[in-house]
């Protein structure tokens, strides 16, 4: 399984708008993409505030999160992570 992690730092004062964009735009687009099995939103309300979207894929994703038209994020990045099983031997 492949996990894609998208992380974005939210512009001060735009946290609620940023989370709403991820919920209403980004998650549905990801879930409608071929191979996407699940999506999970994580938030950090400290300084700086940030939003993380974890998506799980059965194939290497061909997916770009893009950015909304408004200024919600000061920085965003994505990376693919491969899941490994723990070795308890």
Which residues does each predicted region cover?
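Short alpha-helical segments used as structural interaction elements across diverse proteins
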Residues: 1, 20, 53, 72-74
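An amphipathic, aromatic/His-enriched active-site/gating alpha helix that lines ligand/cofactor pockets
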Residues: 24-37, 56-89
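A broad, structure-centric signal for solvent-exposed, well-ordered loop/edge residues
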Residues: 17, 48-49, 88
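Short, well-ordered beta-strand segments in beta-rich or mixed alpha/beta enzyme
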Residues: 2-8, 40-68
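Short, surface-exposed ligand-recognition loops at beta-strand->loop->(often short) alpha-helix junctions
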Residues: 9-22
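Short, flexible segments with low predicted structural confidence
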Residues: 1-3, 18, 34-35
